[in-house]
From Swiss-Prot:
This is Glutamate racemase. The lineage of its organism: Bacteria, Pseudomonadati, Pseudomonadota, Gammaproteobacteria, Alteromonadales. NCBIfam families: glut_race (TIGR00067). The active site is at residues 73, 183. InterPro entries: Asp/Glu/hydantoin_racemase, Asp/Glu_race, Asp/Glu_racemase_AS_1, Asp/Glu_racemase_AS_2, Glu_race. It comes from the Bacteria.
Amino acid sequence: MSGPILVFDSGVGGLSILDEIRRVLPDQNYCYLFDNARLPYGELEEQELIDGCEALITATVAQLGASLVVIACNTASTLVLPVLREALTIPVVGVVPAIKPAALYSQAKHIGLLATPGTIKRSYTHSLIQEFAANCQVELYGSSELVLLAERKASGKQILQGEIAQLLSPIKVSGIDTLVLGCTHFPILKDEIQQYLGDGVLLLDSGKAVAARVSTLIKEESTLNKRQRKGHSKEMIALYTSEVGEGLKKLLAEFGFSTYSKAQTG
């Protein structure tokens, strides 16, 4: 395997995952593919999501010769992983909500899961709760609006604390001491969420766990060349399915992307 690592999401949320991966694998080539034409994924019908993701990702893997795929989207991971693993011959890594560590860290054994409505309703999510948090009271909060707020912030627009409060007020009064950010968009708003909920609520996401898994797979395949220059990846490509504004292009440039263009969708 010598091609780029392909990181996929519906929008810019997966950049939080890519950031963690680059910390442990700074010398790899990366492609960030985001399907912003169909954002937010939490509102899509299951089969529409599966078919669209499979077509887009497999086409991009073939085009770039990608070495590994990261589905940096909780909603897509709950549905698309089995299909992609059957269709592709390279490793495919998904994102799992950090329910297990939340159950371990929670002192009150009262935790919350904040995710898209799609992730909240999946049987996979409820199986995780039964397996890893059976000893906890678990509150479920679904929000697509928070995804769009994260996209706004990423494009350079201001997010008002009142907007956060309007969406998260049920969480603030719930009494939880640990909140799982079960959508990769939500770490973009981590500072705003923490400020609103207060220091008494621990926020957890899956970024570091995904990065560790990717690092293990890459090293197992002996693709990490330790003689490469340290501190910067060699190539950063961004592909999108719908045109992006100047604010988002600026963010991509600041993130280190040298090339960004529309993905080939068929």
